[in-house]
Amino acid sequence: MQPSGTYTPEQFEIMVHNLTDVVHGEGGTARGIGWNAPYKIAGKTGTAQVKGVGQGESYVESRTAEHLRDHALFIAFAPVDDPQIAVAVIVENGGHGGSVAAPIARKLMDQYLIGNAGPAVKVSVPTSGDAD
């Protein structure tokens, strides 16, 4: 990949390395999708808060109405050394990006890059009636 914008080549390489660690690093928030990938993925997980949590309060998903639960986000590109696909996945009220949105992105990238998305990916998405 070639750097663009106002970043130096060194800064660009650091960013790509860090994004790759999100998926392939030991403590990466999307490491669950990278362990058996036949190509390197660079990505970033995210969670978008829907309902504000007041000072002194804590967010408890099981006690939050489904329509007020956090959105799950994941953006990625692959293969890192020769990018051919970029994806952005948003799962409304899905929870965490690494466990919900990232597996969906991996399936999309597998299908595009190797023509086989493999077995279905299990994601835990909230169901109606989990909260009031």
Model-derived features with residue positions:
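Active-site beta-strand/loop architecture of penicillin-binding DD-peptidases
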Residues: M1-S4, E10, V16-P119
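Gram-negative outer-membrane assembly/targeting C-terminal domains
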Residues: L113-D132
